[in-house]
């Protein structure tokens, strides 16, 4: 049974009790117990670019790249704690070479290259509506990235679990490439998760309205669970809690903190595949290239939300939307380059 998550820790640095929590987080980071994982396998197609999304320039009067903004956010924590954080960057087959070359070209934006580790996301075959493999060429099956739930298995496959164990990393902060305001390896978030004896934490924002297209952190059979926005029923959208507030109101922003020993446990399990209808480039029976304008088959993905369901606890950690949520999914309009620029400027970041 799914029910709303009734407890949420709200980030408010004016509260005196936050000082010990921040100390716990800073101490863990300073001792090298926290690593970060950047999910950066996407391309900038919807932004009008054929390059990796992270290389997109959002600057106005100067060059400001998405990757650069994220490294700057991470450097804020390095300066606070005096300790570099290992950053594991998940790329895809399509953008791996371009991503690595871009980081080298920009001298890793001043971050020590020994602390940045690239690995490629695993791929999954695509099929037509009858379940038959689509072909990319006469000798190659059409494939696509296997979803954001496959990140830890791909990291292990690259051998980086040995770096994690050797460095004594106990927590991994996983975050998406397209939110240029988020704090990474955030001491308060880390400290709050540890202090509340949770094995996972999720940064959440309060939804602007019941129809906002974000997944919602809930409880399902007393386990943490994320319900995607398209799965929310009208009853759930209109439900209120004991205070008369919207009940299903904690929107996730794909910024999670996982205890590494829990990740090892989950890695031994099989996450369910999600079938997603997509436009898939392929060849037809005569070997001619097909670039469909409408969906023509299925991709198969695993999702982080299914990892969350396998955990006993997940702290809902509310952040201030205007200070930590500037997603770049479109070129204009909602969640766009334009809207992100405005939020960055409001936070004093020169563009």
Locate the predicted segments by residue.
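An acidic- and aromatic-residue-enriched active-site/binding cleft used to recognize and process polar
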Residues: 39-43, 52, 60, 92-95, ...
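Generic domain-boundary/flexible-linker signal
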Residues: 47-48, 98, 129, 183, ...
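Conserved beta-loop-beta/alpha segment of the NTase-like Rossmann-fold superfamily
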Residues: 108-109, 113-213
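A broad, structure-centric signal for solvent-exposed, well-ordered loop/edge residues
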Residues: 54, 62-65, 126, 265, ...
């Amino acid at each position: 049974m799914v029910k709303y998550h009734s407890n949420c820790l709200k980030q408010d640095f004016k509260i005196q009790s936050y000082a010990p929590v921040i100390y716990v987080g800073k101490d863990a980071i300073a001792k090298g117990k926290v690593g970060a994982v950047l999910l950066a396998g996407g391309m900038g197609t919807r932004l009008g670019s054929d390059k990796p999304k992270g290389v997109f320039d959002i600057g106005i009067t100067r060059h400001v790249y998405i990757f650069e903004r994220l490294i700057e956010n991470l450097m804020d924590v390095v300066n606070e704690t005096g300790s570099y954080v290992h950053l594991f960057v998940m790329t895809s087959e399509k953008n791996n070479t371009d991503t690595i070359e871009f980081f080298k070209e920009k001298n890793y934006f001043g971050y020590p290259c020994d602390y940045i580790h690239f690995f490629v996301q695993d791929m999954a075959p695509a099929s037509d509506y009858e379940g038959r493999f689509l072909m990319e060429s006469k000798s190659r099956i059409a494939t696509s990235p296997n979803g954001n739930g496959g990140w830890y298995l791909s990291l292990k496959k690259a051998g980086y679990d040995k770096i994690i164990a050797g460095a004594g990393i106990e927590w991994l902060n996983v975050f998406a490439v397209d939110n240029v305001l988020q704090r990474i390896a955030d001491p308060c978030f880390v400290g709050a998760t540890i202090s509340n004896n949770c094995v996972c934490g999720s940064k959440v924002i309060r939804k602007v309205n019941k129809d906002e297209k974000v997944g919602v952190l809930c409880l399902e059979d007393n386990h943490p669970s994320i319900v995607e926005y398209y799965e929310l029923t009208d009853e759930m959208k209109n439900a209120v809690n004991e205070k008369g507030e919207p009940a299903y109101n904690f929107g996730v922003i794909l910024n999670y903190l996982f205890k590494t020993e829990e990740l090892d446990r989950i890695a031994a399990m099989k996450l369910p595949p999600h079938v997603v209808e997509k436009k898939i480039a392929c060849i037809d029976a005569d070997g001619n290239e097909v670039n469909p304008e409408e969906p023509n088959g299925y991709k198969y993905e695993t999702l982080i939300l299914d990892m969350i369901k396998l955990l006993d606890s997940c702290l809902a950690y509310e952040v201030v939307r205007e200070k930590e949520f500037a997603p770049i999914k479109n070129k204009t309009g909602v969640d766009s380059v334009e809207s992100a620029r405005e939020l960055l400027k409001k936070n004093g970041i020169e563009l």
